[in-house]
Amino acid sequence: MKARTDNRADLDPSSWDPALDAVIAAPKHHKVLFENERLRVLEVTLEANDEEPVHHHRWPSVFVFDQVQGPVHDFAPDGTQLPPNRDLIKAIEAWKGQGCLVVNMAPQPLGRVFNASGKTIHGIRVEMKANR
C-alpha cells in the first residue's frame, strides 16, 4: 500500500456529497446525541481492528476522546493510505492516557479510518456548523 499526500483537503466542504456524511454513510460508528442549526454532537466508536465505511466530516470539530490508542490509519476512497492526521498523532503522543484527550479537528474529506490498535476508540465529536 503506497502513501500519498492528501490534496483533497482544500475542496469546499459545502460541496461534499451529503449522502457520504459520517452519520449517513457510517451509522454504526457515528451516533447523533444532539443537533441544532449550530452544532452536532456525535458519539464515535470504532472497535479494535475495525474499519469505518467511506465518509466525510464537513464541519470543523472538537473531538474529546476518552479511549484512543494508535496505530490508526486513514485511507482515501481508492484505498491509498493518507498521511497521519498530525494534530491527532501529536495529541496521542503527548497524552498520558489519563482523563480525556481533546483534539481540534479541521473538516475531513472523504476517506475511511482503520483502527489497527488492540483497543476500542471512543469519544464525543462536537461539530461546529457555519453560522447561518
Enumerate the language-model features and the residues they cover.
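A short, N-terminal "cap"/entry segment at the start of jelly-roll beta-barrel domains
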Residues: 1-44, 48-54, 81-110, 114, ...
